[in-house]
Amino acid sequence: MTVELHLGDCLEYMRTMPDKSVDAVITDPPYGINADKGVGGFGASKTDKHYQAGWDVTIPDIDYFDNIERVSPKLFIFGGQFFTKQVQPNGHWLVWDKVGDIKFKNPFGDCELIWTNVKRNSVKKYTVIQQGFIAEEKDRFHPTQKPIKLIKSMLLDYTHEGDTILDPFMGSGTTGVACVQTGRNFIGIEIDPTYFAVAERRIQEAQLQPTLPLEVNA
């Protein structure tokens, strides 16, 4: 199993990658939402630790989407509804249900859409509950950080052990941690040095953990 981490612009790096050189892209691109206004009316400020790195300033242009489609046969894009003009119209949707049967209101949204180009009969709904405003991880490093359990479920459902996964907007490295824990190779790219350092540390810590038997999703 290999891990490659690159600090820099993801588009510049992807332009050097051969066609279909990875097995899947799982990524959460910036949506271009104004952080001063918060998410879903919650009113978070850029003085919050999650906003200090200047995340979510611009939306990736069409070259980004052309390149992820070129380097990978399988695409999974969180917040895909923000990119309907950039992605292919024949895609499908995964649904991340953050609430399930629990009756509470999540100000960041009760569900999240993930655009994918996998076949329709493979699409699933994931119920990975984020109770309150905090993700399942003890430490939260990024404003849009996803639960490791969610990414692991997607990897087990749609990829194979030994596959290579690319995350062009690596953030705090959750996809990389999930790849280490499920025996996938990982290529992560992050332009922000602060988040890159966090991702590097988290992935290194995951590599030091003993390998546990995988729970294969049905």
Where in the sequence are the language-model features?
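A short acidic, glycine-rich active-site loop
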Residues: 48-62
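Conserved SAM/SAH-binding loop
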Residues: 8-12
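Extreme N-terminal starter segment of soluble prokaryotic enzymes
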Residues: 1-5
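A short glycine-rich, Lys/Arg-flanked "PGG" loop and its adjoining helix->strand segment in the class I
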Residues: 58-74
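Class I S-adenosyl-L-methionine
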Residues: 17-27, 31, 35-49, 69-218
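A conditional alpha-helix N-cap/helix-loop micro-motif detector
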Residues: 6-7, 57-61, 144
